[in-house]
Regions:
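Helix-to-loop junction immediately C-terminal to a conserved catalytic motif
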Residues: 40-42
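ABC-fold ATPase nucleotide-binding domain signature/coupling loops
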Residues: 46, 109-136, 151, 158, ...
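Conserved "ABC signature" C-loop
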Residues: 76-120, 145, 161, 218-221
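C-terminal portion of ABC ATPase nucleotide-binding domains
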Residues: 168, 185, 190-239
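Conserved ABC transporter NBD signature motif
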Residues: 48-56, 65
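The feature captures the beta-strand-to-loop junction immediately N-terminal to the Walker
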Residues: 26-28
Length: 239
């Protein structure tokens, strides 16, 4: 993976995202996760081979490729318009019933019912909490019905209640879908089919949660740090 100036940002890497399964991508800040995501999206050049269903990414129309992706990021991007506009991205051929179904699947129907689909939203998500905005972003991804789901720290900015809603909606939505889940929270990855661990631009570990957690390596170190932080936070809440 290269910068526009040709500088190597990450790699060499070798892995496969299994069709219909979820792969988690973890690693410390600066490990190269963002570079990998941007490369998969077609925003960054690369050397070697990167194929999508056997077709080289360079040969694909990148705009069309991105239209097949349901994306949920760390900071939900909402547009100036109504709740309906934000979920449908302004497409007028989508029935309100479909919008409502997507909102229900994203656990957003509770607060949307209070405001209505025509509730106006500014481009800074005014009037909504971060958790509510993230659930609208999830509803948008569900309605898009992408063949590939890309989840980039989707719960990093959320409180515990909102995180529970979003993770529940995501888990239900990506069943039987091909998904890449970038996260710093390792405990929820016990049911993930494959975990990739990056450090300094390289893939240093790969496997299942149970195996990686028992091996000496970066994943076990990060997991121990995660658990210590959770225990400390629980102590603060109990105090």
């Amino acid at each position: 993976m290269l910068s526009p100036q040709g500088k190597r940002l990450a790699g060499p890497l070798s892995f496969t995202l299994q069709s219909g399964k979820t792969t988690a991508l973890v690693g410390p800040s600066g490990a190269g996760k963002t570079s990998l995501i941007n490369t998969i999206l077609g925003f960054m050049p690369y050397q070697g081979s990167l194929t999508i269903n056997g077709i080289e990414l360079r040969e694909l129309d990148h705009a069309q490729w991105r239209q097949t992706i349901s994306w949920v990021g760390q900071n939900p991007l909402l547009l100036h318009g109504t709740i309906r506009d934000n979920v449908t991205l302004g497409k007028h051929n989508i029935a309100d019933e479909q919008v409502t179904q997507a909102l229900q699947a994203a656990y957003a129907q509770e607060f949307v019912e209070q405001q209505g689909l025509d509730y106006p939203i500014s481009d800074r998500s005014a009037g909504l909490s971060v958790g509510q905005a993230q659930r609208l972003a999830l509803a948008r991804a569900i309605l898009q019905n992408g063949r590939f789901w890309l989840l980039d720290e989707p719960t990093a900015s959320l409180d515990a209640r909102s995180e529970q809603y979003v993770m529940r909606g995501l888990t239900e939505s990506i069943q039987q879908r091909t998904a890449l889940f970038v996260t710093h929270q390792l405990q929820p990855l016990q049911s993930v089919e494959q975990i990739l661990v990056m450090e300094n631009g390289l893939l240093v570990q790969a496997g299942h949660f149970e195996d990686l957690s028992q091996q000496s390596g970066l994943f076990a170190t990060m997991l121990a740090a995660n658990q210590a932080l959770q225990a400390a936070n629980k102590g603060d809440l109990d105090a």
